[in-house]
Amino acid sequence: MNYFIFLVVACLLTAGTEGKKDGYPVEGDNCAFACFGYDNAYCDKLCKDKKADSGYCYWVHILCYCYGLPDKEPTKTSGRCKPGKK
């Protein structure tokens, strides 16, 4: 009986929650957003426009990196960037 109550409580706590992820946001062509000049303000705004918690310019790759993106928002995969292909 205790396991059943625990299971019900666990289901109620997770119902309706949307997962969040971190990563490089992309358009449909798998191209990430460049941030020349290490513009953290640009990346933070871009990420927040995509409903992320925050973002910054990752200087090693010169790309915007977001924290807390919604699961439905596409992020960079291991494939190559294909400009113009949506």
Swiss-Prot record:
Residues in LCN-type CS-alpha/beta domain copies: 21-82
Cysteine pairings via disulfide bonds: C31-C81, C35-C57, C43-C64, C47-C66
Localization, UniProt: Secreted
Proline amide: residues carrying this PTM: P83
Main location: secreted
Single GO cellular component term: extracellular region
Tissues expressing the protein: Expressed by the venom gland.
Entry keywords, A to Z: Amidation, Disulfide bond, Ion channel impairing toxin, Neurotoxin, Secreted, Signal, Toxin, Voltage-gated sodium channel impairing toxin
Any GO BP: defense response
GO molecular function: sodium channel inhibitor activity; toxin activity
InterPro entries: LCN-type_CS_alpha_beta_dom (IPR044062), Scorpion_toxin-like (IPR003614), Scorpion_toxin-like_sf (IPR036574), Scorpion_toxinL (IPR018218), Scorpion_toxinL/defensin (IPR002061)
Signal sequence annotation: 1-19
Domain comment in the entry: Has the structural arrangement of an alpha-helix connected to antiparallel beta-sheets by disulfide bonds (CS-alpha/beta).
Function: Alpha toxins bind voltage-independently at site-3 of sodium channels (Nav) and inhibit the inactivation of the activated channels, thereby blocking neuronal transmission.
Family designation: Belongs to the long (4 C-C) scorpion toxin superfamily. Sodium channel inhibitor family. Alpha subfamily.
The protein's name: Putative sodium channel toxin Ts17
Taxonomic source organism: Tityus serrulatus (Brazilian scorpion)
